[in-house]
Design a protein with these regions (language model features):
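Intrinsically disordered, low-complexity, mixed-charge
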Residues: 1-97
């Protein structure tokens, strides 16, 4: 889903070997390079959650990069959901909770 300006919001949950391999740092760097805002965090079950907002085409590029991941990561599955942007993020950050 995208608004009239082409902006969208992406929610992704990434499964596989994605913790302990600098995956969150990788997502932070990739999202910053693409000019996206949002957050990334580890989930207690070993998956990683990504919330990102920005240009729909840039978000689609992020999805491709999330599938690849950093060296040492092995993505086995990714669930994605598109919504209209909410504008709740000013930058991209790693949440440590």
């Amino acid at each position: 889903m995208a608004d009239q300006t082409g902006r969208a919001s992406l929610h992704a949950v990434v499964s596989g070997i994605v913790q302990g391999v600098f995956y969150r740092r990788f997502v932070l760097q990739e999202a910053a390079e693409l000019g996206l805002s949002g957050r990334v965090r580890n989930l207690f079950d070993g998956r990683v959650e990504v919330e990102a907002e920005g240009d729909r085409q840039k978000l689609e590029q992020l999805i491709k990069r999330l599938h690849k991941g950093p060296p040492g990561a092995q993505v086995t599955d990714m669930a994605t959901e598109w919504t209209d942007p909410r504008g709740e993020y000013k930058d991209f950050r790693v949440d440590y909770d």
